[in-house]
Design a protein with these regions (language model features):
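Hydrophobic alpha-helical segments within soluble ligand-binding/sensing domains
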Residues: 70, 136-170, 189, 231-238, ...
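Flexible loop/hinge segments that line or gate small-molecule binding clefts
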Residues: 101-145, 164-172, 295-303, 307
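Beta-alpha junction/loop-to-helix N-cap segments that form part of ligand/metal-binding clefts
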Residues: 64-126, 138-141, 261-264
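Extracytoplasmic "Venus flytrap"
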Residues: 27-46, 50-51, 58-76, 80-82, ...
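Short, solvent-exposed amphipathic alpha-helices that sit
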Residues: 39-54, 146-150, 185-212, 233, ...
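Sec-dependent signal peptide cleavage junction
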Residues: 18-26
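Hinge/cleft segment of the Venus flytrap/periplasmic-binding protein
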Residues: 26, 169-174, 178-182, 186, ...
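Hydrophobic alpha-helical
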Residues: 84, 90-112, 194, 216-299
């Protein structure tokens, strides 16, 4: 079994290197928003293996966060004979772009499987798109749940450790929120509910709501201006914050909430450089840092007591659902045949992969 898995993974890695090649006749084309996203990298590894296990030959292509590149590459793949097109849309929420791609794929009468990045901010609009082509499906999450679960986790942790987190003893907990992308549906929901649900837990227990560290910031978040949810953005922001907001000045940021684990990593690196959140958590002040995805890097940080918690976005589950549905559509089966019963099929066109809390315990 181990030898088989090793062969599958080796094959998958080889296939994933075909990122500059258009799909040939009978190959399954997977178009990625970017190869630079940590979570999507884990999905890609799992998806290549899952597709290979189903007998599909995969061509992965990096769109480098450029929608025109993605559109052009998909059109080329269709011309060269791809047997299915799997799309991780660059322009999340752009229904016009999704319609253009769907129409091109539909014209070739091959399966169109979109995943992870929403095609519209309007669920009814998305439903109409996918119901308009029987060989299509969307695999994602109930995007509000990550923020809700994160917010509840944050709120309970703060409540349980209130006095030790209140570094300046003003009776309130100051926080910073790092947002991955200004327009992305999931980023918007995580930013909203990550704080609102924490506040619900705190106020229900008679504690004040969280207070954004910078009263002049009306948005109450700092966003990656490149929309790439990157650790570079959060690192730079956190370094700048610590120069002015620190224990010496009596206004230290006491809580860090991030839209994803990569941004949590950047914040922790900046905190560590300033003497906080050191490996092991001994002999230093540890500022609670929360993320989403439960990446391997985040799990290691949590084990090292440098990070507090994350919400697991199941990369293997996402890959399994995409591979199962794609193979079913290629073979002319019911698209949801053999799908893991833990996945939620909604309205005949979309599948939600569940989230879970991860604290390392």
């Amino acid at each position: 079994m181990k030898k088989f898995v090793s062969k599958v993974l080796a094959g998958a890695l080889g296939l994933s290197m075909l990122c500059g090649v258009a799909a040939a006749e009978g190959e399954t084309y997977v178009s990625w928003y970017t190869f630079g996203d940590v979570y999507l990298s884990s999905v890609r590894t799992a998806l290549d293996a899952a597709m290979e296990a189903k007998g599909l030959t995969v061509v992965d292509k990096d769109s480098n966060a450029n929608q025109q590149t993605q559109t052009d590459d998909i059109n080329t793949a269709l011309v060269t004979g791809a047997n299915a097109v799997v799309v991780n849309l660059v322009e999340s929420g752009a229904i016009g772009t999704a319609e253009t791609l769907m129409n091109a794929i539909k014209e070739k009468d091959v399966p169109a499987v979109f995943f992870n990045r929403a095609v519209s901010t309007d669920n009814a609009e998305a439903a109409e798109l996918f119901k308009g082509y029987e060989k299509s499906a969307f695999i994602g999450t109930d995007f509000t749940q990550a923020g809700i679960m994160q917010g509840k986790m944050v709120g309970q942790y703060v409540l349980d450790h209130y006095d030790e987190l209140d570094l300046n003893k003003d009776g309130k907990i100051s926080y910073v929120m790092f947002k991955g992308d200004e327009a992305n549906q999931e980023a918007i929901a995580r930013t909203k509910y990550g704080v609102e649900c924490a506040d619900e837990v705190l106020t229900a227990a008679g504690k004040p709501a969280l207070e954004f560290y910078d009263a002049s910031n009306a948005n109450k978040y700092l966003v990656d201006l490149n929309g790439t949810w990157s650790n570079t953005a959060s690192f730079d922001y956190m370094q700048t914050i610590l120069a002015q907001y620190n224990e010496a000045n009596g206004n230290m940021v006491e809580l860090v909430i991030c839209n994803n684990d990569d941004m949590a990593l950047g914040a922790i690196n900046a905190l560590s450089n300033a003497g906080y959140n050191l490996a092991g958590g001994e002999g230093c002040t540890v500022i609670p840092v929360f993320g989403v995805d439960a990446t391997e890097a985040a799990k290691e940080l949590i084990a090292n007591k440098q990070m507090t918690g994350s919400i697991k976005q199941d990369a293997e589950g996402m890959a399994d659902a995409v591979a199962t549905i794609t193979a079913n559509l290629i073979e002319g089966k019911d698209k949801f045949e053999g799908l893991n019963e833990n996945y939620e099929v909604v309205d005949g066109w979309t599948v939600n992969i569940p989230y879970s809390v991860y604290t390392g315990e």
